[in-house]
Structures are given as structure tokens and as C-alpha cells.
Amino acid sequence: PKKNRIFYTYGKNNSFMIEKEKTIKLNCQKKTEKGKIFAVSASSKPSSLILDVLKKYNVSSYTPMHSSYKFCVIATGEFDFYAAKERAYEWDYAAGHAVAENAGAIISTLENKKFKYGKDDYKNLSLMIKRNEILDA
């Protein structure tokens, strides 16, 4: 809403953004400079764990951003990567997860395990979203 965008999905390869009354199909196609990896972060001062992950994936820079909007800007191709330690609940991620994954993003834990829902306490494990396997192209 802050940027006058609405995101929605209704299944694999069917994620969309409505902006300025125009519907755009999302496919995670990179819209930033090739050869560089741009990440979103939940904080302006990421933890040492997250900084290590950003370094491991050769992230060029990161931008702090709140809410599941982070998932959506990866689906648009405006950013390439997001990593988060254990901190949120399933309902905090579910809608953004659906939009990003159905646009082609790869979503897992930081340990590259499948991200699961339906846990007894609803607490999320760590999270990693990659625009695709080749982040800088």
C-alpha cells in the first residue's frame, strides 16, 4: 500500500502485481545491475549470523525493509536475496511466501531445508529466499 502496489497469487507461475491500474505478471526476473547481488534485510543492523550469510552469498548491498513486502520485491526482481534467523510466526510469512514462490523464487531455511508450515508452536525456522539459483544474473 505504501507504494500503491497490490500483490496476489493463485498458484504456480501465477503471481501478479497491480500498479497504477496495470496488472503485471511476476517471474523473479532480475531488474537490478547484473553481476551484483542485492538483498533485503529485516534490520538496518543485521545480526552476525545474517551478515555471515550475506557474505557467503556475495551480497553486494542490503536494504532494510519491514513486513512480508520483502518477499514481494524479490518476486518483482527488484531484489535478489533475503535471509532471516528464527523470529516470526507462520502467519507473518505465508502470503508473501506464496507470492514469491509462485513467481519462481526459491524458499528454504538457512540450512537449505524445505520451509515447512503447520508446526505445533507456529514459530518459523530460519528463512532464505533466493530470486533464483543464479543470483547475480
Each language-model region and where it sits:
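Acidic beta-strand-loop-alpha-helix segment within the catalytic core
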Residues: 1-71, 124-137
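Oxyanion/phosphate-interacting regions
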Residues: 48-56, 70-137
